[in-house]
Amino acid sequence: MALTVKEKKNVEVVVPQPRQKHVIQGEPTVAYETRDLNLWYGKDHALKNINLSIYEKEVTAIIGPSGCGKSTYLKTLNRMVELVPSVRISGNISYRGRNILDKSFQVEELRTRVGMVFQKPNPFPKSIFDNVAYGPRIHGIRNKKILSEIVERSLRGAAIWDEVKDRLHENAYGLSGGQQQRLCIARCLAIEPDVILMDEPTSALDPKSTLKIEELIQELKKEYSIIIVTHNMQQAARISDKTAFFLNGEVVEYDSTDIIFSNPSDKRTEDYITGRFG
């Protein structure tokens, strides 16, 4: 539901309120359905016939050795991969029943529904408050009270509010690496996405900060669908519900994380997770 706020000059701004989250009963709901997805960088065939169903309110881990297509696949889910001039894509990626590769699907709409957290924390050279308020402002929200509510809610959602509530107007660069990454997660939450993509979100962090992010992911999956690329096998086993193993641009195996790590059906999966290669 939206709240209409009258600002100066009697201009009405429609402020998005947190969308009601529904408990999924019975069969899980599909967030993304990827069918026969192929992707080329020039002549390099980077993704080959990818078929995956990714479910809502779960953590899905994408694992595999460097260069296997993990991050490329992740970036197809919000069409960031299209920023590469030589890229060519075929197949279908359905998000909640709509093909996001259809040119009629507006990228701006997609990216308000699908947030992304990158490998290295990338706060803007602004205050902590302005980092989180940036997205809502882009979408037309100017009312200070509403912005303050969004900022607090997002920082609480990213489990960093208590650490920064007295320094909201300090530069975000003054935060530690782990705090910066949680700030970036808060910035992502501020636009109320349905899906959060995470590309190696803890690889640049120390073990203590990594643990905080992992605990946060477990909380966030109650409200959001999370897809995480990771090289860390132990991390994938700890935090994910399902795991897809990529190799040479193909999905070798996709199943519940318990099965992937305890009883994989493909020897290549077993060899990878036990460290025989990769």
Curated annotation (Swiss-Prot):
Residues binding ATP: 64-71
Quaternary structure and partners: The complex is composed of two ATP-binding proteins (PstB), two transmembrane proteins (PstC and PstA) and a solute-binding protein (PstS).
Catalytic activity entry: phosphate(out) + ATP + H2O = ADP + 2 phosphate(in) + H(+)
A GO cellular-component term linked to this record: plasma membrane
Residue stretches making up the ABC transporter domain: 32-273
Top EC class, one word: translocase
SUPFAM superfamilies in UniProt: P-loop containing nucleoside triphosphate hydrolases (SSF52540)
SMART domains found in the cross-reference section: AAA
Family the UniProt entry places it in: Belongs to the ABC transporter superfamily. Phosphate importer (TC 3.A.1.7) family.
PANTHER family the record matches: ABC TRANSPORTER I FAMILY MEMBER 17 (PTHR43423:SF1)
Superkingdom in the source lineage: Bacteria
InterPro entries (alphabetical): AAA+_ATPase, ABC_transporter-like_ATP-bd, ABC_transporter-like_CS, P-loop_NTPase, PstB-like
EC number: 7.3.2.1
Gene Ontology BP terms: phosphate ion transmembrane transport
Bilayer disposition of the protein: Peripheral membrane protein
GO molecular function, one term: ATP hydrolysis activity
Pfam families: ABC_tran
Cellular localisation: Cell membrane
Residue ranges that the Swiss-Prot or TrEMBL entry lists as coiled coil: none
Protein name: Phosphate import ATP-binding protein PstB
Keywords: ATP-binding, Cell membrane, Membrane, Nucleotide-binding, Phosphate transport, Translocase, Transport
